[in-house]
Amino acid sequence: MYKRQIISIFIHQGYQWFLLRSYQVGDLTKVYPIARGTGPLITTFISILFLGVVLDKFVIFSILLLCFGIFLLGANNYKKSNLNEIKYPLITGVFIGSYSLIDGYGARISESAISFMSWSFLINALIFPFVLGIIGEKKVLQRVYNEGKKIFIYGVTLSYASYALVVWAFTKAPIPVVTSLRETSILLSIFIGYFLLKEKMNLLKISSIVIILIGVIGIKLF
């Protein structure tokens, strides 16, 4: 268990750095769909090809459909992207898939999934500021301290609570399925944008919502 916990911490460090780098080189509308859509694909392919996980072919198709729906959200922006705006989110997605697998299997063999996740979360949070210092990103910490303490606290709390539920779910269902359903949170961001921020609901967003929902229904049915 401890070996998986150590590996998990290192992978989370990589994920956080590449996510930070992704947002430095690209807009949210470009970065987010690529990173979140790649994670479930990595988890699914590794699980099937190397870990002996057996999934119904309709579930696999539904996962692929769901990921396509997520990728579709950023379709208008991809043609304007440079290599870094694609590369860093893709690598971020690889880390998402990797830590999902490590955390999932670590939680399954531990006495308490929440305890496994909590210790990893705490140690990861303590290490990351030093990583930022080493890679020359101290300004990020300074900005959080000067401008975003409340948002940081809210973000950490919500991040812990939501990922604790995900890790618990890893012990109850196939990891590729949980990872894929986790990414449906992107629908919430669309609805918040439409109802609260008064963003326009265009054909691309509607198509994305429909495809993602079909993927979710397919996963649940099969």
Which positions does each model-derived feature cover?
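Structural motif at transmembrane-helix junctions in multi-pass transporters
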Residues: L19-A35, R108-S115, A164-T184
